[in-house]
Amino acid sequence: MPGLVENLKDLHALVHELDDTRMTTMAQVSNLPMENEQNDITDVVSYNHYFGWYGGKLEDNEAWLDAFHEMHPERPIGISEYGCEGITTYHNDNPKGGDYSEEFQAVYHEHMAKIIEERPWLWATHVWNMF
């Protein structure tokens, strides 16, 4: 998109002009490449990822985070959205992605809690829950 990067840089500069104590961030969509120049504009960056729910598998979360951290070891990275849907009346003794069961929802969030805890360099994480 022509002008997008310049606009983002202008907004970042304006924030710091108005309040130099305030950090800037941006939530990137999952398919934006790690090496995209947008990732270098704000003070910190986050990605919306739903690996293991809308596509891919649960283990893609840690693989992606570790690859981003390896590529940008000094760049603060966060997860601006993650999660999966569950329906209170759906249950499954063998939960799997896409079944909407409460059991898979528990598996998903327990997995995410573990990988988040193991990566102290994550600056923020946000479960998507309709906010």
What are these model-derived regions, one by one?
Residues 5-29, 34-131:
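Substrate-binding clefts and catalytic carboxylate motifs of secreted carbohydrate-active enzymes
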Residues 1:
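Active-site neighborhood of divalent metal-dependent phosphoester/pyrophosphate hydrolases
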